[in-house]
Amino acid sequence: MFPVFHLSGESRRRMLQTALRFPHVFKARAEDSHKGTFGTLAVVGGSAGMSGAPVLAASAAMYLGCGKVRAGFNQDTLPFAVIAGFPEIMLDTADGLTKRQGINAWTAGCGLGTDAAAVETVAAVLARNRDEAVVLDADALNILSTDAETRNLARGCKNLILTPHPAEAARLLGTTVAQVQADRTAAVRKIGAILGATVVLKGHKTLVAASDTEIYVNESGNAGLATAGSGDVLGGIIGSLLAQGVPVFEAACAGAWLHGAAADVIKESAGIAAGLSAGEIAPAARWLRNWITESM
């Protein structure tokens, strides 16, 4: 049963106008497309007790149209044989997944932990083919903030996106959350300059910056996104767009916008802000992407 979503005339007009900024995201699919056309995303995370984080990211990637999704868990054995509700997602250990070929993009860090195995996993992802796009989130960012070798590998990654919340940004900069929030523009620019990455500084009016672009200020979203797992979903959305061939900066900006706009769709359709669960975001983003594509 598909959820029923709708938007008012003004919301439709506003969202269609914004979508014009993301031409690679909102385009019709060719009739002769196949799963290989839309790329393979690898999601690595999920230390013991945190298996749900990569599931949220991987399922979001499926909802946003990725051709194939693999999920790797930072555990010695798989936490489950198949993901209930998402049998399409192929499972592996994090160590096993980092050795696989045929990956177009990565989302790493969701519930990963910061133990030695986690550090090795992030390093292995960054040391692969430097043309593979990489999203680092959550614990992968915490590892970057403390491990010099991993930071050096990150600087050599051509297509790198970092998605810190203010506390993670503060750790990357060696400063405080208050200082990050006092000048978010300076913070997002500085992180990008230090690590040579596109940076998505999450929060109210998420900022996206790359070294050669102006800062994108995201206007979508509402307080419903303040829920556990929301960031994992964002990482999956951005990773999915990268795997599908969307350019790095556009994928970061469009991912942030779709993530927030999905929450706006849910609020307008069902009146839900408080109590929104992270798993409800991606189905709304899927609906929105398809509705916009058909409307343009």
Curated annotation (Swiss-Prot):
Query: Which PANTHER family does the record match to this protein?
Result: ATP-DEPENDENT (S)-NAD(P)H-HYDRATE DEHYDRATASE, ATP-DEPENDENT (S)-NAD(P)H-HYDRATE DEHYDRATASE FAMILY MEMBER
GO molecular-function terms, A-Z? ADP-dependent NAD(P)H-hydrate dehydratase activity; ATP binding; NAD(P)HX epimerase activity
The Enzyme Commission number assigned here is 4.2.1.136
InterPro entries cross-referenced by the UniProt entry: CARKD, Ribokinase-like
Supply the name of the protein: ADP-dependent (S)-NAD(P)H-hydrate dehydratase
Annotated Gene3D superfamilies: 3.40.1190.20
- Encoding gene per record: nnrD
For this UniProt record, the keywords arranged alphabetically read as follows:
ATP-binding, Lyase, NAD, NADP, Nucleotide-binding
The catalysed reaction is: (6S)-NADHX + ADP = AMP + phosphate + NADH + H(+); (6S)-NADPHX + ADP = AMP + phosphate + NADPH + H(+)
Q: Family, per the entry?
A: Belongs to the NnrD/CARKD family.
**What does this gene product do?**
Catalyzes the dehydration of the S-form of NAD(P)HX at the expense of ADP, which is converted to AMP. Together with NAD(P)HX epimerase, which catalyzes the epimerization of the S- and R-forms, the enzyme allows the repair of both epimers of NAD(P)HX, a damaged form of NAD(P)H that is a result of enzymatic or heat-dependent hydration.
Residues the record lists as binding (6S)-NADPHX: 53, 113, 165, 232
Kindly state the subunit structure of this protein: Homotetramer.
* GO biological process, any: nicotinamide nucleotide metabolic process
Q: Could you tell me which residue ranges the YjeF C-terminal domain spans?
A: 18-292
- Nucleotide-binding found in the keyword field: yes
Q: Give the top-level enzyme category.
A: lyase
Q: Any idea which positions bind AMP?
A: 202-206, 231
Q: Which cofactors, if any, are listed as required?
A: Mg(2+)
